[in-house]
C-alpha cells in the first residue's frame, strides 16, 4: 500500500452484451490465465441456461444472486494483550461485491455438473433462491461474526 498518494481505481468497461459493469467484473473473476474469451463464453452460456430454466431476465437473476450472497459483516483477527480475538467488522461495499463474486465462483467450481457454464447457472439459480454453496459460505461468515459479537468493542 503506497503512502504517498491514493492509487486511482481502474475503470472497468461494461460488458458488450448486457452493458453491465458488475457482469464485466464477474467475468474478470471467472477468467484464468488471461483467457477472457473463455470466461465470456462460460458466463454468457450460464446466463442463457438461466433464462431457459427460469424464464426470467438473466441479469435480474444474476444481480439478485449477487445481492443475496453479499456478506454484511465478517471477522478480523485482532491481537490484544497476548490473545487473538476474532472481531466482527462491517464489510466495505467494494469488498462485499468482490467476496460475493469469489464465493459464487468457488462454489460453482466445486459442483459436479459437466460444464462450468452449467455449474455456474445452477449456482446462480440456487443463490437467487437463497440456497447453495455460496449462500452457505455467507451464512457461515455471518454466524462467526454473531458468535464473536462480544469482542466488537475491540474495533479497529
Curated annotation (Swiss-Prot):
It comes from the Bacteria. GO terms for cellular component: small ribosomal subunit. CDD domains: uS7_Bacteria. GO terms for biological process: translation. The keyword Ribonucleoprotein applies. Keywords: Ribonucleoprotein, Ribosomal protein, RNA-binding, rRNA-binding, tRNA-binding. The lineage of its organism: Bacteria, Pseudomonadati, Pseudomonadota, Betaproteobacteria, Burkholderiales. This is Small ribosomal subunit protein uS7. It comes from Leptothrix cholodnii (strain ATCC 51168 / LMG 8142 / SP-6) (Leptothrix discophora (strain SP-6)). Part of the 30S ribosomal subunit. Contacts proteins S9 and S11. One of the primary rRNA binding proteins, it binds directly to 16S rRNA where it nucleates assembly of the head domain of the 30S subunit. Is located at the subunit interface close to the decoding center, probably blocks exit of the E-site tRNA. The gene is rpsG. Coiled coil: none annotated. The keyword RNA-binding applies. Belongs to the universal ribosomal protein uS7 family. Gene3D superfamilies: Ribosomal protein S7 domain. GO terms for molecular function: rRNA binding; structural constituent of ribosome; tRNA binding.
